[in-house]
Protein backbone atom coordinates (compact mmCIF):
# COMPACT_ATOMS: atom_id res chain seq x y z
CA UNK A 1 0.00 0.00 0.00
CA UNK A 2 1.25 3.47 -0.81
CA UNK A 3 2.10 5.64 2.18
CA UNK A 4 1.12 9.34 2.23
CA UNK A 5 3.43 11.87 3.91
CA UNK A 6 2.29 15.39 4.59
CA UNK A 7 4.49 18.51 4.57
CA UNK A 8 3.48 22.06 5.23
CA UNK A 9 5.45 24.37 2.97
CA UNK A 10 4.69 28.08 2.97
CA UNK A 11 1.16 27.50 4.11
CA UNK A 12 0.48 24.98 1.33
CA UNK A 13 -0.18 21.41 2.08
CA UNK A 14 1.90 19.07 -0.07
CA UNK A 15 1.20 15.36 -0.05
CA UNK A 16 3.95 13.01 -1.33
CA UNK A 17 3.13 9.49 -2.30
CA UNK A 18 6.17 7.30 -1.59
CA UNK A 19 6.37 4.16 -3.76
CA UNK A 20 8.96 1.44 -3.00
CA UNK A 21 11.57 1.05 -5.78
CA UNK A 22 11.42 -2.52 -7.14
CA UNK A 23 14.71 -4.47 -7.80
CA UNK A 24 15.03 -7.31 -10.33
CA UNK A 25 16.08 -10.59 -8.72
CA UNK A 26 18.80 -12.69 -10.37
CA UNK A 27 17.07 -15.89 -11.45
CA UNK A 28 16.37 -18.42 -14.18
CA UNK A 29 13.71 -17.76 -16.78
CA UNK A 30 12.22 -19.85 -19.58
CA UNK A 31 10.31 -19.18 -22.77
CA UNK A 32 9.39 -21.30 -25.79
CA UNK A 33 13.02 -21.21 -26.99
CA UNK A 34 14.88 -22.12 -23.83
CA UNK A 35 16.35 -20.99 -20.52
CA UNK A 36 18.30 -17.85 -19.69
CA UNK A 37 19.59 -16.27 -16.50
CA UNK A 38 18.84 -12.68 -15.60
CA UNK A 39 21.02 -10.54 -13.32
CA UNK A 40 20.01 -8.06 -10.65
CA UNK A 41 20.36 -5.17 -13.07
CA UNK A 42 18.07 -6.76 -15.62
CA UNK A 43 20.83 -7.87 -18.00
CA UNK A 44 21.62 -11.50 -18.76
CA UNK A 45 24.59 -13.66 -19.68
CA UNK A 46 25.41 -14.03 -23.37
CA UNK A 47 28.07 -15.95 -25.27
CA UNK A 48 29.98 -16.99 -22.16
CA UNK A 49 30.45 -19.70 -19.55
CA UNK A 50 29.65 -18.75 -15.97
CA UNK A 51 29.54 -20.25 -12.51
CA UNK A 52 26.08 -20.08 -10.96
CA UNK A 53 25.80 -21.42 -7.44
CA UNK A 54 28.90 -23.57 -7.89
CA UNK A 55 27.92 -25.07 -11.24
CA UNK A 56 29.15 -24.12 -14.70
CA UNK A 57 26.75 -23.19 -17.49
CA UNK A 58 27.26 -22.00 -21.04
CA UNK A 59 25.09 -19.39 -22.78
CA UNK A 60 24.87 -18.69 -26.51
CA UNK A 61 24.99 -15.33 -28.29
CA UNK A 62 21.27 -14.79 -27.61
CA UNK A 63 21.64 -15.58 -23.93
CA UNK A 64 20.03 -19.02 -23.98
CA UNK A 65 21.50 -21.88 -21.96
CA UNK A 66 23.37 -24.44 -24.07
CA UNK A 67 22.90 -28.20 -23.59
CA UNK A 68 24.59 -31.28 -25.02
CA UNK A 69 28.02 -31.33 -26.64
CA UNK A 70 29.85 -28.04 -27.17
CA UNK A 71 33.34 -27.38 -28.52
CA UNK A 72 34.97 -24.67 -26.39
CA UNK A 73 38.17 -22.75 -27.02
CA UNK A 74 39.94 -20.99 -24.14
CA UNK A 75 43.06 -18.81 -23.85
CA UNK A 76 43.38 -18.24 -27.59
CA UNK A 77 43.31 -21.96 -28.28
CA UNK A 78 45.70 -23.09 -25.55
CA UNK A 79 42.83 -25.05 -24.01
CA UNK A 80 40.15 -26.40 -26.28
CA UNK A 81 38.00 -29.48 -26.46
CA UNK A 82 34.57 -31.01 -26.25
CA UNK A 83 32.43 -30.28 -23.19
CA UNK A 84 29.08 -31.76 -22.28
CA UNK A 85 26.19 -29.88 -20.70
CA UNK A 86 23.32 -31.78 -19.12
CA UNK A 87 20.35 -31.87 -21.53
CA UNK A 88 17.93 -31.05 -18.69
CA UNK A 89 19.77 -28.89 -16.16
CA UNK A 90 22.39 -27.44 -18.50
CA UNK A 91 25.21 -27.81 -15.98
CA UNK A 92 28.63 -28.86 -17.27
CA UNK A 93 29.33 -32.51 -16.47
CA UNK A 94 32.66 -33.73 -15.06
CA UNK A 95 34.26 -37.10 -14.41
CA UNK A 96 32.92 -40.38 -15.78
CA UNK A 97 29.73 -39.93 -17.79
CA UNK A 98 27.58 -42.45 -19.67
CA UNK A 99 26.15 -40.59 -22.65
CA UNK A 100 24.00 -42.32 -25.27
CA UNK A 101 25.37 -45.70 -24.21
CA UNK A 102 29.05 -44.72 -24.35
CA UNK A 103 31.50 -43.82 -21.61
CA UNK A 104 33.45 -40.57 -21.53
CA UNK A 105 35.75 -38.91 -19.05
CA UNK A 106 35.24 -35.16 -18.80
CA UNK A 107 37.80 -32.89 -17.15
CA UNK A 108 38.18 -29.14 -16.81
CA UNK A 109 39.95 -29.30 -20.19
CA UNK A 110 37.11 -31.18 -21.87
CA UNK A 111 36.61 -34.80 -22.86
CA UNK A 112 39.79 -36.85 -22.62
CA UNK A 113 41.06 -38.61 -25.76
CA UNK A 114 43.82 -41.07 -26.62
CA UNK A 115 45.73 -42.95 -23.90
CA UNK A 116 44.97 -41.51 -20.45
CA UNK A 117 45.99 -42.16 -16.85
CA UNK A 118 42.98 -41.60 -14.59
CA UNK A 119 43.53 -42.15 -10.87
CA UNK A 120 46.41 -44.52 -11.54
CA UNK A 121 44.57 -46.63 -14.13
CA UNK A 122 45.09 -46.51 -17.87
CA UNK A 123 42.31 -46.11 -20.42
CA UNK A 124 42.00 -45.34 -24.11
CA UNK A 125 39.53 -42.90 -25.63
CA UNK A 126 38.75 -42.41 -29.30
CA UNK A 127 40.97 -39.59 -30.63
CA UNK A 128 38.04 -38.07 -32.53
CA UNK A 129 34.80 -38.96 -30.72
CA UNK A 130 36.35 -39.21 -27.23
CA UNK A 131 34.35 -42.30 -26.20
CA UNK A 132 36.13 -44.99 -24.18
CA UNK A 133 37.39 -47.92 -26.23
CA UNK A 134 37.83 -51.54 -25.17
CA UNK A 135 39.53 -54.60 -26.63
CA UNK A 136 42.70 -54.46 -28.71
CA UNK A 137 44.19 -51.06 -29.60
CA UNK A 138 47.33 -50.68 -31.72
CA UNK A 139 49.92 -47.92 -31.72
CA UNK A 140 53.13 -47.45 -33.71
CA UNK A 141 56.21 -48.44 -31.72
CA UNK A 142 59.98 -48.34 -32.09
CA UNK A 143 60.14 -51.83 -33.59
CA UNK A 144 56.71 -52.04 -35.22
CA UNK A 145 53.09 -52.05 -34.14
CA UNK A 146 52.50 -52.30 -30.39
CA UNK A 147 49.27 -53.72 -28.99
CA UNK A 148 47.41 -52.94 -25.78
CA UNK A 149 44.27 -54.56 -24.46
CA UNK A 150 41.49 -52.77 -22.59
CA UNK A 151 39.02 -54.70 -20.46
CA UNK A 152 35.62 -55.06 -22.19
CA UNK A 153 33.78 -54.16 -18.96
CA UNK A 154 35.92 -51.68 -17.01
CA UNK A 155 37.96 -50.32 -19.91
CA UNK A 156 41.15 -50.62 -17.86
CA UNK A 157 44.39 -51.40 -19.69
CA UNK A 158 45.67 -54.93 -19.14
CA UNK A 159 48.97 -55.47 -17.34
CA UNK A 160 50.93 -58.58 -16.48
CA UNK A 161 49.57 -61.99 -17.46
CA UNK A 162 46.15 -62.03 -19.13
CA UNK A 163 44.17 -64.86 -20.70
CA UNK A 164 42.18 -63.43 -23.60
CA UNK A 165 39.93 -65.67 -25.69
CA UNK A 166 41.82 -68.73 -24.48
CA UNK A 167 45.30 -67.42 -25.23
CA UNK A 168 47.94 -66.07 -22.85
CA UNK A 169 49.58 -62.67 -23.19
CA UNK A 170 51.93 -60.62 -21.06
CA UNK A 171 51.63 -56.84 -20.92
CA UNK A 172 54.42 -54.50 -19.91
CA UNK A 173 53.39 -51.09 -21.29
CA UNK A 174 52.18 -53.17 -24.27
CA UNK A 175 51.88 -56.85 -25.22
CA UNK A 176 55.31 -58.48 -25.35
CA UNK A 177 56.58 -60.19 -28.49
CA UNK A 178 59.34 -62.66 -29.33
CA UNK A 179 61.81 -64.10 -26.80
CA UNK A 180 61.27 -62.61 -23.35
CA UNK A 181 62.58 -62.99 -19.82
CA UNK A 182 59.87 -62.51 -17.17
CA UNK A 183 61.26 -62.81 -13.67
CA UNK A 184 63.68 -65.72 -13.89
CA UNK A 185 61.64 -67.56 -16.53
CA UNK A 186 61.93 -67.50 -20.33
CA UNK A 187 58.93 -67.32 -22.66
CA UNK A 188 58.20 -66.84 -26.32
CA UNK A 189 55.41 -64.70 -27.75
CA UNK A 190 54.22 -64.58 -31.34
CA UNK A 191 56.04 -61.74 -33.15
CA UNK A 192 52.79 -60.59 -34.76
CA UNK A 193 49.84 -61.58 -32.55
CA UNK A 194 51.72 -61.47 -29.21
CA UNK A 195 50.13 -64.65 -27.84
CA UNK A 196 52.36 -67.01 -25.86
CA UNK A 197 53.69 -69.97 -27.84
CA UNK A 198 54.68 -73.40 -26.60
CA UNK A 199 56.57 -76.37 -27.99
CA UNK A 200 59.55 -76.07 -30.32
CA UNK A 201 60.59 -72.55 -31.40
CA UNK A 202 63.56 -71.75 -33.62
CA UNK A 203 65.52 -68.62 -34.42
CA UNK A 204 68.40 -67.90 -36.72
CA UNK A 205 71.75 -68.35 -35.04
CA UNK A 206 75.30 -69.10 -36.08
CA UNK A 207 75.98 -71.16 -38.08
CA UNK A 208 72.35 -72.28 -38.38
CA UNK A 209 69.02 -72.45 -36.59
CA UNK A 210 68.86 -72.53 -32.81
CA UNK A 211 66.02 -74.47 -31.18
CA UNK A 212 64.22 -73.85 -27.90
CA UNK A 213 61.40 -75.71 -26.21
CA UNK A 214 58.59 -74.16 -24.17
CA UNK A 215 56.49 -76.22 -21.79
CA UNK A 216 52.98 -76.86 -23.19
CA UNK A 217 51.37 -76.14 -19.82
CA UNK A 218 53.31 -73.25 -18.29
CA UNK A 219 54.94 -71.85 -21.40
CA UNK A 220 58.29 -71.72 -19.59
CA UNK A 221 61.47 -72.33 -21.57
CA UNK A 222 63.22 -75.55 -20.57
CA UNK A 223 66.87 -76.01 -19.66
CA UNK A 224 69.03 -78.97 -18.69
CA UNK A 225 68.06 -82.59 -19.41
CA UNK A 226 64.48 -83.06 -20.57
CA UNK A 227 62.34 -85.93 -21.85
CA UNK A 228 59.91 -84.76 -24.52
CA UNK A 229 57.52 -87.19 -26.19
CA UNK A 230 59.66 -90.09 -25.00
CA UNK A 231 62.93 -88.71 -26.36
CA UNK A 232 65.83 -87.16 -24.47
CA UNK A 233 67.18 -83.67 -25.12
CA UNK A 234 69.53 -81.31 -23.35
CA UNK A 235 69.34 -77.51 -23.25
CA UNK A 236 71.93 -74.98 -22.15
CA UNK A 237 71.34 -72.34 -19.48
CA UNK A 238 69.72 -70.07 -22.06
CA UNK A 239 67.34 -72.78 -23.24
CA UNK A 240 69.08 -73.61 -26.53
CA UNK A 241 69.03 -77.29 -27.47
CA UNK A 242 72.39 -79.00 -27.95
CA UNK A 243 73.10 -80.48 -31.38
CA UNK A 244 76.00 -82.61 -32.60
CA UNK A 245 78.88 -83.72 -30.33
CA UNK A 246 78.99 -81.90 -27.01
CA UNK A 247 81.10 -82.05 -23.87
CA UNK A 248 78.83 -81.28 -20.95
CA UNK A 249 79.60 -79.95 -17.49
CA UNK A 250 79.93 -83.46 -16.07
CA UNK A 251 82.92 -84.00 -18.33
CA UNK A 252 81.21 -86.64 -20.46
CA UNK A 253 80.62 -86.49 -24.19
CA UNK A 254 77.24 -87.00 -25.83
CA UNK A 255 75.85 -86.84 -29.33
CA UNK A 256 72.63 -85.07 -30.32
CA UNK A 257 71.08 -85.44 -33.74
CA UNK A 258 71.88 -82.26 -35.73
CA UNK A 259 68.35 -82.17 -37.16
CA UNK A 260 66.01 -83.61 -34.54
CA UNK A 261 68.20 -82.57 -31.55
CA UNK A 262 67.42 -85.81 -29.70
CA UNK A 263 70.09 -87.71 -27.77
CA UNK A 264 71.54 -90.57 -29.82
CA UNK A 265 72.64 -93.81 -28.18
CA UNK A 266 74.46 -96.81 -29.56
CA UNK A 267 77.13 -96.64 -32.23
CA UNK A 268 77.93 -93.20 -33.61
CA UNK A 269 80.35 -92.49 -36.46
CA UNK A 270 81.98 -89.05 -36.50
CA UNK A 271 84.66 -87.99 -38.97
CA UNK A 272 85.38 -91.62 -39.81
CA UNK A 273 85.71 -92.68 -36.19
CA UNK A 274 83.20 -94.84 -34.34
CA UNK A 275 82.05 -94.13 -30.79
CA UNK A 276 79.65 -95.90 -28.52
CA UNK A 277 77.04 -93.79 -26.76
CA UNK A 278 76.26 -96.04 -23.82
CA UNK A 279 72.49 -96.17 -23.14
CA UNK A 280 73.28 -97.54 -19.67
CA UNK A 281 75.29 -94.41 -18.89
CA UNK A 282 72.74 -91.84 -19.98
CA UNK A 283 74.05 -91.85 -23.54
CA UNK A 284 77.59 -90.79 -22.61
CA UNK A 285 80.38 -91.91 -24.91
CA UNK A 286 82.12 -94.99 -23.52
CA UNK A 287 85.73 -94.30 -22.60
CA UNK A 288 88.40 -96.33 -20.77
CA UNK A 289 86.08 -99.20 -19.91
CA UNK A 290 85.18 -102.63 -21.21
CA UNK A 291 81.61 -103.22 -22.38
CA UNK A 292 79.75 -106.18 -23.79
CA UNK A 293 77.88 -104.80 -26.80
CA UNK A 294 75.41 -106.95 -28.70
CA UNK A 295 76.87 -110.01 -27.02
CA UNK A 296 80.40 -109.24 -28.13
What are these regions (language model features)?
Residues 2-296:
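Extracellular adhesion/carbohydrate-binding repeat motifs centered on closely spaced tryptophans
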Amino acid sequence: MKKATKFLLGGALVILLLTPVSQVKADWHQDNIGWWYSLNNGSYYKNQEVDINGKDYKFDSRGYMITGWQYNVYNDGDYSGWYYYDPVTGEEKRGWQLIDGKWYYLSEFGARFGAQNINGKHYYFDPVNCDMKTGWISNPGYSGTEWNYYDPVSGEEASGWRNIDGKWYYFLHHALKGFQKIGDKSYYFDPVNSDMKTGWISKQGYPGLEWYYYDPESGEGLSGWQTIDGKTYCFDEFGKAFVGQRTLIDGKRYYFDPVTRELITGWVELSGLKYYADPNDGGAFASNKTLIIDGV
